[in-house]
Amino acid sequence: MMACRTLCLVVVMVASLGTSGVGGRSVEGASRMEKLLSSSNSPSSTPLGFLSQDHSVNKRQVFDQACKGVYDRNLFKKLDRVCEDCYNLYRKPFVATTCRENCYSNWVFRQCLDDLLLSDVIDEYVSNVQMVGK
């Protein structure tokens, strides 16, 4: 009897979460990210562009050698973590690669900050991008 009540309670909770619009932010964020990435003219930002490149995926270096600013491993890790988390949110390889382009100085990185709810510390991240940038 107790197991039946617990099961019914779980079913009711799951059903109410499904109809409450809990997943709305992800859908909204995904459509904004798709629109942002489709407006970019970079070949790596096309949804299937990564398939035309080498299929094996190597672990990305912590820092980008094209970035000519201050070399600070912790700073690069912090910026790279935003792109990794954004990739984990959308599970699209082109999100991670486009996020890192131009030493993190791009609109996808900014959108990732917003989608990861980091807008309250955006000034700190902008400052970090300027430090490592070109």
UniProtKB/Swiss-Prot annotation:
Produced by the medulla terminalis X-organ in the eyestalks and transported to the sinus gland where they are stored and released. Present also in the ventral nervous system. The modification D-phenylalanine is found at F63. Residues 1-24 form the signal peptide. InterPro entries: Crust_neurhormone_CS, Crust_neurohorm, Crust_neurohorm_sf, Hyperglycemic, Hyperglycemic1. It holds the Pfam family Crust_neurohorm. Disulfide bonds join C67-C103, C83-C99, C86-C112. It is found in: Secreted. One of its GO terms (molecular function) is neuropeptide hormone activity. The keyword Secreted applies. Stereoinversion of L-Phe (form CHH-A-I) to D-Phe (form CHH-A-II). Keywords: Amidation, Carbohydrate metabolism, Cleavage on pair of basic residues, D-amino acid, Disulfide bond, Glucose metabolism, Hormone, Neuropeptide, Pyrrolidone carboxylic acid, Secreted, Signal. The modification Valine amide is found at V132. GO terms for cellular component: extracellular region. The modification Pyrrolidone carboxylic acid is found at Q61. GO terms for biological process: circadian rhythm; glucose metabolic process; neuropeptide signaling pathway. PANTHER family: ION TRANSPORT PEPTIDE, ISOFORM C. Belongs to the arthropod CHH/MIH/GIH/VIH hormone family. CHH is the most abundant hormone in the sinus gland of isopods and decapods which controls the blood sugar level. Has a secretagogue action over the amylase released from the midgut gland. May act as a stress hormone. This is Crustacean hyperglycemic hormones isoform A. The lineage of its organism: Eukaryota, Metazoa, Ecdysozoa, Arthropoda, Crustacea.
